[in-house]
């Protein structure tokens, strides 16, 4: 097979007219290879040439990057399952922070790992005295994903409760609280 492929690039005098290049690889072959790469690497390779660009749109490449229950996630986040979107488009939409549950939660896929990430605003949790202005202020800010933070003025105890009903894929997850401790500044309080 290699000899007959090489013969395509030799003219009648036995002189090589042009040599084979990466663009000559079959699209299915390229797609089979790039499916083993991380999504950012796939997107970088898509800029190489037309063959890599076309292969980067193959549904089977992106289906392997999506969580197993991505149909449920798409329905939960978008409210419908788009029938005319390719898997790459679905992956791209899920990688953006998608707001749901009355704007109190955002969910997205980690671009490199495909893991599901979620952020919950202070308004999406039950926090001790959060609605009492003697203890808390809600301050608009661009530093928060939700464009608002709960600023604690004073309190004697602090409890946070919350429940999440979400179709997370099977796996191990971590929970983090973002708190900023320090003195009150002019803008806060």
Language-model segments: which ranges?
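CRL adaptor-proximal regions
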Residues: 1-35
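Plant-skewed but cross-kingdom recognition/interaction modules and surfaces
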Residues: 3, 32, 55, 59-189
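Generic preference for well-ordered secondary structure
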Residues: 17-18, 36, 46-50, 146-148, ...
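Conserved aromatic-histidine-acidic binding/catalytic patches
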Residues: 21, 40, 165
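Short hydrophobic alpha-helical "box" of cullin-RING ligase substrate receptors
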Residues: 25-37, 42, 46-56, 62
